[in-house]
């Protein structure tokens, strides 16, 4: 798949992908309509040429002429496919700002209760490895230290 082929079938504007051309004569009504639908993962997908594609990846290809291995939604909103919200990242960088786990009990990213120590433990992922930051009796302090560690190690990719 290349930019020229995608541009033959799709236009994009304001983070939305629109059908420019369709292959099947019975689908001509789609021309000019927004392409795809929202998947259970929260990403907008479109079926084209017998394959399912994430819309943000097609928009990135249309604009930049290549498709990187990883593309990040800067603001974390998987449906916000505006160009200014998309950036090429490494796998590690993309993991740094993923949403907080649903089973998180502390309410703080990277902070969990350590029974044996009777303290909150702060861990941060660095280059796909968990790094122990420290143990804290106070949850607010653990949260603050965790935020500072993410800013230090993740930089612009840190997620609060």
Task: Give, region by region, the residue ranges found by the protein language model.
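Generic structural detector for well-ordered beta-strands
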Residues: 47, 112, 135-137
